[in-house]
Amino acid sequence: MADVATKHPMEDEVKKTEASSLVGKLETDVEIKASADKFHHMFAGKPHHVSKASPGNIQGCDLHEGDWGTVGSIVFWNYVHDGEAKVAKERIEAVEPDKNLITFRVIEGDLMKEYKSFLLTIQVTPKPGGPGSIVHWHLEYEKISEEVAHPETLLQFCVEVSKEIDEHLLAEEEEVKTPETPSLVGKLETDVEIKASAEKFHHMFAGKPHHVSKASPGNIQGCDLHEGDWGQVGSIVFWNYVHDREAKVAKERIEAVEPNKNLITFRVIDGDLMKEYKSFLLTIQVTPKLGGPGSIVHWHLEYEKISEEVAHPETLLQFCVEVSKEIDEHLLAEE
């Protein structure tokens, strides 16, 4: 990790500006090993995961309005800065996926006690001629008085969070790559944000999976119970679905059900997936969103391929995302 290079000419510019006004800006670059796309996605697509990467600095990020990574949406951060627990309510001002850029405007919270306005822009650029990226942080602000300090410690906070996110992303890559070198085992995970309650979404898979086809008829054509009871460990269900534009089937055994965690695990025991995988487990866990309505659906696919030629089931993970969104719409329409 290269040393952080704060741009001194910019500091001079800040000092000159401050002589006549309370407006200022600070910038710095952080060199990381992760890809620009993945780092950008942490703030645009899943900022609620930043707390996993940097738990000492960020305790949580909740969506208050709109959708993750969409201009106009409101997010709410819990963080620790200068040894104090703080909060920030921010509106997403700009998102440019092709430039891996996102801008947040602080609209409420601790920073508003000292600043009339505060914008944070994060832009991530792939390093020319090599792996890794450069994270460029740009803070633009207006202080409420001359007594307020420039947010240099907050800029350092951004640097620390960047480094921890980088480590987190690299660890995630290793987690997938390491098992694949000696074996054919892998796992894929994703989160889907929904507006429906965790219990109702979980019940669609545990209590009435035969209703999923009503919610997502283009993807799921039916689910029949072959043995046991719906939502019971050991029961066998049989799915008819369309994936990669082909009609397919899957016979699955329910491996685990934890209603208090809104969790269910299916093990594929027969069907099209068994042509390419020795084993395949799908776990669906739904968690209520902290401090607001809605939930997060976490999909976890764990599998062993029959050969290196078999692709990772990334298109199946995307299929799960699409089905989740359609179930959400179906549940909201029922309300």
UniProtKB/Swiss-Prot annotation:
Transmembrane segments: none annotated. It holds the Pfam family Bet_v_1. GO terms for cellular component: cytosol; mitochondrion. InterPro entries: Bet_v_I/MLP, MLP-like_ligand-binding, START-like_dom_sf. Coiled coil: none annotated. SUPFAM superfamilies: Bet v1-like. GO terms for biological process: defense response. Belongs to the MLP family. Can bind steroids (in vitro), and may also bind other types of hydrophobic ligands. PANTHER family: MLP-LIKE PROTEIN 423. This is MLP-like protein 28. It comes from Arabidopsis thaliana (Mouse-ear cress).
